[in-house]
Amino acid sequence: MTFIHWRYSPAQIQALLPGWLTAEEFDGSAWVGLTPFLMEDVRVPGTPALPWLSRFPETNVRTYVRDALGRRGLWFLSLDAGRLLPALGGRAGYGLPYHWSDMSVRVEGERRAYRCRRRLIGPAGARCDADVELGAPLLDTERDELTDFLTERYRLFTVVGGRSAHAEVEHRPWPLRRARLVRLDQDLLRAGGLPSPEGDPLLHASSGVRVRVGMWNLS
């Protein structure tokens, strides 16, 4: 998994949120993450993984928010999945803005090449090509507050049936590495309602963790 983050003004992010959420700031900025990764062993609890359904690339555009109770979490501006059924399931089951896309992840040594071309359920032609080179592991003593702000989130917010909802996200802390962006050509942020980002992005990479997303609850 690769985390690619940019600063945005809080007002720009707040304009894209429902009224019951507030853009969370760090160092005076709201933050948006572009996160391409490979989903593996995806399954409903108590059921077996299916080779043709349980492994697929995904790329998310997300931001960081608080609700009226002060609970921190994620708000997704878009989620692209390389399989149609998970995209439909994410929309129907969680109210998340999933899109079905033509996607791939290529691994060559310390290089990761992510490709995404949106097919259906959304603006045609939206894309993301990202080439990333992994660096040294990030030691626990090198993790700062911003790193945890951007990567350690244990709740997602959504709207189900017109009502505010949330789901708990369980995982151990991400084992992180430094990363360098070799190439990026994307318009997923624009398709999600954002202007083009300014400045160099902040990158982290991870070998991944096992994640469990609970059922949604009305907030």
Residue spans of the language-model regions?
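A compositional/structural signature for long, glycine/proline-rich flexible linkers
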Residues: 1, 7-8, 12
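Short secondary-structure boundary micro-motifs
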Residues: 7-8, 46-49, 88-89, 194-196
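Glycine/small-residue-rich interface belts in oligomeric ring/scaffold proteins
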Residues: 10-59
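Active-site acidic/histidine clusters and adjacent loop/turn architecture
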Residues: 1-2, 21
